[in-house]
Amino acid sequence: MSLGLAGSLQAQLALEIVIQSLENCVLGPNQEKSLSVQNRVQDFQGASLLVCAREVIASNLSRPETPAPLQVPEMASLLSLQEENQLLQQELSRVEDLLAQSRAERDELAIKYNAVNERLEQAVRLETGELEAQEPRGLVRQSVELRRQLQEEQSSYRRKLQAYQEGQQRQAQLVQRLQAKILQYKKQCSELEKQLMDRSTELEQQRLRDTEHSQDLDSALLRLEEEQQRSASLAQVNAMLREQLDQANLANQALSEDIRKVTSDWTRSCKELEQREAVWRREEESFNTYFSSEHSRLLRLWRQVMGLRRQASEVKMGTERDLLQLGGELVRTSRAVQELGLGLSASLHRAESKAEAALEKQKLLQAQLEEQLQAKLLREKDLAQLQVQSDLDKADLSARVTELALSVEHLQNQNSEKDQVNRTLSDKLEALESLRLQEQTTLDTEDGEGLQQTLRDLAQAALSDTESGVQLSSSERTADTSDGSLRGFSGQRTPTPPRHSPGRGRSPRRGLSPACSDSSTLTLIHSALHKRQLQVQDMRGRYEASQELLGSVRKQLSDSEGERRGLEEQLQRLRDQTAASAQAQEDAQREAQRLRSANELLSREKGNLTHSLQVTQQQAKELRQELEKLQAAQEELKRQHNQLEDAQEDSVQEGARARRELERSHRQLEQLEVKRSGLTKELVEVREALSCAILQRDVLQTEKAEVAEALTKAEAGRAQLELSLTKLRAEEASLRDSLSKMSALNESLAQDKLELNRLIAQLEEEKVALLGRQQQAEHATTMAVEKQELLEQLRLEQEVERQGLQGSLCVAEQAREALEQQILVLRSERSHLQEQLAQLSRQLSGRDQELEQALRESQRQVEALERAAREKEAMAKERAGLAVKLAAAEREGRTLSEEAIRLRLEKEALESSLFDVQRQLAQLEARREQLEADSQALLLAKETLTGELAGLRQQVTSTEEKAALDKELMTQKLVQAEREAQASLREQRAAHEEDLQRLQHEKEAAWRELQAERAQLQGQLQQEREELLARMEAEKEELSKEIAALQQERDEGLLLAESEKQQALSLKESEKTALSEKLMGTRHSLAAISLEMERQKRDAQSRQEQDRNTLNALTSELRDLRAQLEEATAAHAQTVKELEERTGNLGRQREACMREAEELRTQLRVLEDTRDGLRRELLEAQRKGRDSQDSSEAHRQEASELRRSLSEGAKEREALRRSNEELRSAVKKAESERISLKLANEDKEQKLALLEEARVSVAKEAGELRASLQEVERSRLEARRELQELRRQMKTLDSDNGRLGRELADLQGRLALGERTEKESRREALGLRQRLLKGESSLEALKQELQGSQRKLQEQEAEFRARERGLLGSLEEARGAEKRLLDSARSLELRLEAVRAETSELGLRLSAAEGRAQGLEVELARVEAQRRVAEAQLGGLRSALRRGLGLGRVSSSPAREAPAGGSGDGLSSPSPLEYSPRSQPPSPGLIASPAPPDLDPEAVRDALRDFLQELRSAQRERDELKVQTSTLSQQLVEMEAERDHAASRAKQLQKAVAESEEAWRSADRRLSGAQAELALQEESVRRSKRECRATLDQMAVLERSLQATESELRASQEKVSKMKATEAKLESDKRRLKEVLDASESRSIKLELQRRALEGELQRSRLGLGDREAHAQALQDRVDSLQRQVADSEVKAGTLQLTVERLSGALAKVEESEGNLRSKVQSLTDALTQSSASLSSTQDKNLHLQKALSTCEHDRQVLQERLDAARQALSEARRQSSSLGEQVQTLRGELASLELQRGDAEGQLQQLQQALRQRQEGEAMALRSVQKLQEERRLLQERLGSLQRALAQLEAEKRDLERSALQFDKDRVALRKTLDKVEREKLRSHEDTLRLNAERGRLDRTLTGAELDLAEAQQQIQHLEAQVDVALEGNHNPVQPEAGEQQLELQQEVERLRSAQVQTERTLEARERAHRQRVSGLEEQVSTLKAQLHQELRRSSASVSLPPGTPEK
């Protein structure tokens, strides 16, 4: 008995320990199962101790399995809400960890309790088993005692549960304290935000300082411009230069037109020739194929032809007589050819191109004829097989002989008649073809006779062939005559083959007849054809050589003439530059006169040479003379360059330079002698060639004499040029003296001289390159001389051929007549060309004056060019002769333009010295007079040089032998110079590339520094955020300690959230997809940004490659110039084109460079303005950037100075204003040609600026978010205070305050999550918080808005009118802002910069506003979702209030019916606390539950579905109205007149609104006694609901009226169906809006849950509205008035349409200027910010109204007044709001209001739906207005030109990329945090897994131990069984009970162990399931985040790939 009592006491102690542990588990710090226990406690009255304990344990053990899976969805839902807020995520995760630990401990305790319970039962059973035999009654008493003790324990447990309830109340107090701490935390957050605002203000101040700095820079630029404008003389010279340059351009254009004409004629003739060649080739191929088939027959025919040749030799005697006659005729023809040569030399351009084309064609024709003759010879070898074809061959040969003669004469005489000749030839060929056909028919009919006739025809052909061949040469009386005639025959045949090939294709069918038997005739034919073949071959070779020589000579003449013209132009330019260096007008005029005299001398010499050029050799002489003239002119220019260059050198170096100049003069004289010797040699060779070319050597002798006379004239001219050279050198000496005198004044230029010395070194390298080019030109001249020699030899051969052509004298006479006519034409052309040359000389003289003034402006650069020219002259004197200088003059002239382009880049160092040089112009004026005196001395020196040249002429014979050696030396020098030129080019290219690389590196370094500083700033901001978050986390950790006490309430909240979890799961999936889309879009944006960076790098590299290619192009141009001398006729056209293009390109390049400089300035200013926001944080980077920019600016200033030298300085601003479009078009050229790297740098800088702007905007938005966060926190503080006050007022809710606090905490967590999400998405944050504020404020504002729904409709209509007025006002403000911007522009560059900056910024702002609108729509959807969640929480609060008012004291069923009525959600499953979602509420006396049957969740869901459908339809209608906007905007002009009427109507409506507000106030005054009538609140609420149903009916009527208005709008849309083309543009917007609507619908489910939770709190507020029943009639009256107002709103819809048309008229005015549109968009953006600010203030007021409503009736009145004021402020804000997002926000706010009022009155919901429709209509109107603004902006941007559009688009794209990059960075940071959180969760889960594994290991070890014990027990059992058996055998009766008892104990112990193992395994499995679910949830979140990142990346990439011109919707 004592053992039983001891066991029972031990069992009681164990039970007490278990109960204590259960209390610690249940009522301890975790407190998770209080409600469950509490629910179960009521059933414990009649149960036994064990049963109650088992039930408690079972309930606590069965529930962990449910929370574990429920925890995961809850956790998953929280994680799904993580994109809205991540601030409380860690806290929640820690709470969940604590819950998991508490559950684990609870499970362990439950297992232990079960074990203890089982042991207790076993002990009781054992005790009963032991004592049942002895003390059954004592055992019963003990069991009774134990039961009593258990009951006492149960009662104590119930007392503890009561204590737990009290603890729950204390927890409510803890919630309050927690809220106070949260408020403190919010205050700290607000302080931190204030600090951030201070930081943002500091950033703004820094930006202002940066703007001041930029203004200082602008002022510095202005001062620089003032310094540049100080030179008034320079401006005048610029004007004069512009005029003269225009004249020169006109002259150049005239010349270029002439050259184009000549070139076009030549190209056309070449094309025709090529076509004919192609035809001839085809014919030749056909002939080859045909005659190859007849080769065998020709072999047979050849034997017969031999006989024909013998007969042909007899004909030679007759042909010799004809040859004598032809000799005389040939003499006459040679004279005519000489006259023709004179005419050709005079024509030069036009005639030469035609003659060259003709000669080329003749050469090609002859070559082809010769090839055809060869083919014919091959065919003649097969004449044995062509017996049938012999008659056709005869006819063909005879026809071709005549045609050849005609074609030769036509080609030589008249190129213009070649087409006619070809036609005649084609006619003849056709005739021959017809003859062939006829003969073919005759041969088919008469074969035998045909063979005989064939032999006779062959004999006749041979005879005729020999006759033609005899005429080849008088000296060759044998086979050559027939050969030449045959060649002549075949030569005429060339044009004919295309027409005869078909006939020939049929000729093989005639080759079947037998051979003729007349062998003598055949032998004669064979011999004649053989001789003819030899003659044809000889004549063909000679004629080809002669034609090639003629073509090459003429090509050389044309090329040299083109080069001469280019050199003349360049010489004139250089002369102008030389004259400008002195800048003395009188001296410049003298120089111009001298240059003109030189030009006239050149023209006179050319005229003398044209008279002397009686033969083609004289053309070469004239070319050489002209080249000498050009060389002399170039030498003069070089001497002038030497003068100006010497003017810049130090006085110390002048003596050495003078000595070097003397040495150079001697070397130059030697070179002149060498050249003279070479020229004499060439003249001798030419004379010899002419003597060979003329029949009687005496003709060539006379021509030699004439050439000698021309040479003497050229030498005389050269002597004069030598004298001028000496004179210029004397002038140089005088300039040196004057410069030595002025050296004291030039001390200030020492630094500039050092820089110029560096430039000199560079120019020397360039000089080496130019000398190489000169040597190449010299080599080309030598080649030309050799070609001339070949030409002379070929002419000799041509004379022989001409002698052979005497046989065709009759035909030649006819051709001669045509030739004489052509000679007349050529003479006329020659005279015309001479006139053109005279005009060219006049134009060149005019260019002298023009370029003199131009060179005065660019004095500094001219001096550098002169220095380079002087050095080049020195090198030219040392290494080359006059011929080399002549060829190099063209190269130098060409490179001078290239050097000018390069010097533009080098002009940075020259710009400062330019002004000093300009100050020295007066001094140079005086020196100019000295130079004039020195020029006289130079004239004397020139005369002395003429004497010396006379002596040199005597040494010509001796120097001719040295010419060959000199040529070799020259070739070596040319090679060396070419190497030096290549080396200099490589060095220059390397230097240029180094400069480019240096600039690129500097830019990249600046970019990297800016990026680093930007990253540092972002890191600082992120660090601040992280610090803030760390502080928040610290405070959260502090709060988590108190939250641990609230975990029991959390468990209750989890039970309450069970109804929300299904919706949360669906929302989780939708938001997961959204987040995955965001992630994908962000990744795409990152990929796009990386691609953009790579593209920009590639662009920079490509631009570097372009620069390198530019240098390579220069080298290739040199190679092309070398090839021009070798490419003959093609080179002439190319040279002419190049000269022409260079002449035009020089001016265009100057203008383009000018535009480039201005554009670069503007771009620099744009960069400086855009960097204003960065300059505090990026001062170092700015200094580096300014260094690079200063260097680039110096280049730009240098380029601008060079361009200003070619532009009008005084008219620069006006010209630039007029040429805005030209500048834009020039920017494209400049970008592709000059500033590609600069643009790349500027793009990078712009990106930096955009990043900084985005950073500033982010900072601003952060400040705004902080302010909004403060407001949210303030509103939350007020809401919490109001909740506390409401709790104090309603003491019956104390038992449910804990849950209310938990729901508020959940709401706060969601709001915090929303805030975190707002930080992650920049645009969405402000709208989200505003809507959160609005949602929170609307919780209390809806209490008074039931009667204000009517006024809201009126306010909406007034808002539309206010929006119209706001738009008009914003338009006016935009105009004013544009005017101010235009007035504030200081110069054209700044204005252009401002315009572009404003374009880009306003485009960004517009896109940002549109993006904000979209973001606001998205955030509105989110706010609506959160609002619905808040409403769900209000439902829970309302149920709590109902239970607090007495429902909880009646029964559990009613206590749960109230929340079912208040917060039942059709989408959620009922919670354990909500038993009947459709049960009726209790009596009003017990509870003020306002949940009538009309608040059925299903009805609510149906209403919500209807509302969502209506919302979709309204949005569709809004989309349709968007299309109408574009049409209605056109009617805005007409609606201007109706706007006043609408305003009056608005006033009336405002009066009605005031009346309704007065009624509202009266209603509020009547609400004063509502607080004393709490018992009537439920009935009043029911009456209000009936009232709401009535209002719903009225709202249906209003909806129908609105549908009528919408039908009217659709009718108006049909009227403007022409504008529906813009629907395609709106499709994307519609899709986005649909997506937003889908997202909003998905979130609406979530917000519905929140809304139902908040309906409980709203129910409390409804308790104070008991007297609303008395005002039902007033509401009915107001509903009627609302219907009338809706009818009025239909009229107002028309007025709105008119207003939209007026707005379109106002917007039409905006088209007048682009700035107006930009300022409009800016004002709209400002209005958006103002409206958001006003909305936030309105929300604050609404919060105050909430507080006032919760306190007392007086506070309600104050709250009503504040609400009125808030509504007025809201109306003002709505008037100011013009953006789509704010209107959507307002509409969605109204939607939120309607959703919150749904539980109160369904009628109000319909009214608010009607209001929503109206708001959507207003939104559609606003969208149309915004769309119209966008369209107007696009139109204005299109007017700015293609460049500005491209720039704006690129800037918009860049800004989009930057914004997307920033957004991506933020998203990436958030995602990283999320991923870090997920990783931490994974780590926690891993740790849990490890812990569980450890526990499982421990349990396994325990299990193994238990198994071992079991095994031991089994062994003991077996042992005991054995003992029992033994005992049974020995002593059966006494041992049996003990063995049975032991066996029973062992079995019980085994069962207990097994049950413990099973329970342990179950627990472990439950934990593992929970862990797996948690891990799977985390993995799903990770995958969702990754998917969203990918989607965000795709979206960003898609947004980047959109057309830049497309505005963002």
Swiss-Prot record:
GO molecular function, one term: kinesin binding
InterPro entries: Rootletin-like_CC (IPR055167)
Lineage, broadest ranks: Eukaryota, Metazoa, Chordata, Craniata, Vertebrata
Subcellular locations according to the entry: Cytoplasm, Cytoskeleton, Microtubule organizing center, Centrosome, Centriole; Cytoplasm, Cytoskeleton, Cilium basal body; Cytoplasm, Cytoskeleton, Microtubule organizing center, Centrosome
Name assigned to this protein: Rootletin
Taxonomic source organism: Mus musculus (Mouse)
Main location: cytoplasm
Extent of Low complexity compositional bias: 577-586
Biased amino acid composition, Pro residues: 1479-1494
